[in-house]
Amino acid sequence: MFDSDKNSILQSDFCQRLVVHSLLLVFLVILLCTSLYPSSAFIVGLLSSTCAAIGTYEMSSMVRMKFPFSFTRYSSIGSAIFVALTCLTARCKMLLPEHVDLIPWFFLFFWTVHLVFKSRHYKLGPIGSTGLALFCMLYVSVPIRLFLHILYGFVHTDTPFIGIWWAIFLIATTKSSDIFGYFFGKAFGKKRIAPVISPNKTVVGFVAGCIASILVSLIFYSHLPKSFANQIAMPWILVALGIILGISGFFGDIIESTFKRDAQIKNSSDLESIGGMLDVLDSLLLSTPIVYAILLITQNGTFLG
């Protein structure tokens, strides 16, 4: 009786998560495929800024549960503007003066200086308040910035859509690891990897997630467009990336679980079937910098990081 109830709950929860995440992925793929057009680029910038603002707000809210932190709103606004400027400079880099990509960093610097003066009379003081605010902003907004650079890093080449291909590859491999790791871990997992930090993470789920990301990377490798083949140095690296992204996505999830455990909460927010923005982004926050670094190393001279 209890096993039957457990299985039905598991199936219902998994189906709900699968449907919601699948719809989100379909929407993202459609948006990314058209992201080189001005109207879609504007939507990409708006969506990225919104994700950065919400994610930073959730991270700041967790900090607030541990410390008398007063910069939740300012951190969110700072992240949103930082990402919006990044999207603008990344998409229009070829049309703007050299070193224009430094503009978001200049903004972040002066925003931090503004917070230093604003925090003089707060309990944590300038060092504590500004340090925590800067961490919350960087933890969420920098990976999103790197994702935008991956997306628009090939706009100067004869095949500008290769950035879209890499962005979809990154999301597909990482999120497939998330979904399959969750399902197989729930259904068959017994031995826990980190019972104190994240009791739901099991060895079976971890292995299943890595296998899923490898399979997805193999699909991308086998269907690599001929027009892209010459632009991708060392195509076999896609298979290796499947393993790396499966592992990095897992640890990205573990890192966020560590923050949530410290703040004594289950989800970063209360969105149905999602949890929170950080619960959606957690694995990508670690896997995105890895793909960005790989592109810098292997696509030297082609990728504008």
Curated annotation (Swiss-Prot):
Keyword NADP: no
Transmembrane regions listed in the UniProt entry: 24-44, 97-117, 124-144, 151-171, 202-222, 232-252, 277-297
Catalysed reaction equations from the record: a 1,2-diacyl-sn-glycero-3-phosphate + CTP + H(+) = a CDP-1,2-diacyl-sn-glycerol + diphosphate
GO cellular component, one term: plasma membrane
DNA repair as UniProt keyword: no
Main location: membrane
Pathway participation: Phospholipid metabolism; CDP-diacylglycerol biosynthesis; CDP-diacylglycerol from sn-glycerol 3-phosphate: step 3/3
Subcellular locations according to the entry: Cell membrane
Keywords: Cell membrane, Lipid biosynthesis, Lipid metabolism, Membrane, Nucleotidyltransferase, Phospholipid biosynthesis, Phospholipid metabolism, Transferase, Transmembrane, Transmembrane helix
Alphabetized GO MF terms: phosphatidate cytidylyltransferase activity
Superkingdom of source: Bacteria
Bilayer disposition of the protein: Multi-pass membrane protein
Enzyme class, first EC level, given as a word: transferase
Biological processes annotated in GO: CDP-diacylglycerol biosynthetic process
EC number(s) given by UniProt: 2.7.7.41
UniProt record similarity statement: Belongs to the CDS family.
Record's protein name: Phosphatidate cytidylyltransferase
